Amino acid sequence: MVSVGVHVSIAGSIDRAVSRATERGCDTFQIFSRNPRGWSYKPLTDDSASVFIKAMQESGIGPAVVHMPYLPNFASEKENIYSQSVESLSVELSRCATLQIPFLVTHLGHHGPLGKEDGRRRVADAINFALEDAPEGVFLLLENTAGEKNSVGSDLADIGDIIGKIQDQQRIKVCFDTCHAFAAGYDLRTHDLVGETFDRFDSEIGLDLLSVIHLNDTKGILGSGLDRHEHIGLGQIGEEGIRSILHHPRLRSLPFIMETPEDSTRDDIGNIAKVRELAV
């Protein structure tokens, strides 16, 4: 049986995410630990952290995963944005430790006029700065991107290069987003193509570093650079591709977390049911 879940809201209080995940039938889940669209945040109180930890223990589900806010850009040439991004990463690593959440997923950013090589270096430097004083027990997961203009991390080799520049590599893992990969040109539509893509991942990064799958179908065609998630099996990757991912022997034990729409077509419960159907 695969471990499957979705991204859930922390509205009201962070511990409510656990009950929302449980209500949806999740084995695992992802949250933002704070408002993802701003730089400011409310510190976690000891009480709120304790209630969250207790709720997790009682639920029997996990791991929980935190996703970084949207604004940080670790490849930015603008020093104010760059310094805020590093600070934000440091804060999120600490918040994960307080909540006893082992995984923090982050996008890497956009390099702008710096170019790819300098952008990768900036990303690695930012991570090195943030990890210097980061508490133990939290892994930072670098997420592949969809190939938007000037983005860092759409090429698996770029992620491997960045990891090679990080000093404390034992703290680094990877989150693979299927929608992003397909949009960046990695074909996932058949059993053989899934095998080829993850062979490339193993060669350029190492499958031993892969810790979470963002299992999303996609609206965009192969190589489109379009980051538009679709319901499981209803997008360009399709049922055969999703089934092949779920049955890949090196992936099957990983947490599969969806960031799919909730609309009249299907809700989170429906997408979880679809994944479990395809995983049989």
Question: Where are each of the predicted segments found?
Answer:
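N-terminal pre-domain/capping segments
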Residues: M1-M68, P72-V91
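Short, electropositive alpha-helical surface patch
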Residues: N80-L93, K116-F129, D155-G164, D192-D199, ...
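Acidic (Asp/Glu)-rich catalytic clusters
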Residues: S19-C26, T45-V65, S90-Q100, N128-E136, ...
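Active-site acidic/histidine proton-transfer and metal-coordination neighborhood
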Residues: E58, F74-K173
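Conserved, mostly hydrophobic/aromatic
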Residues: A21, H67, S85, C96, ...
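Conserved active-site loop/cleft motifs that coordinate metal ions or position small ligands
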Residues: Q30, S211-H214, S253-T260
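Active-site beta-loop-alpha junctions enriched in small/polar residues
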Residues: H7-A11, R34-P36, P69-L71, G109-H111, ...
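Acidic/histidine-rich catalytic cores of soluble enzymes
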Residues: A124-D125, F129-E230
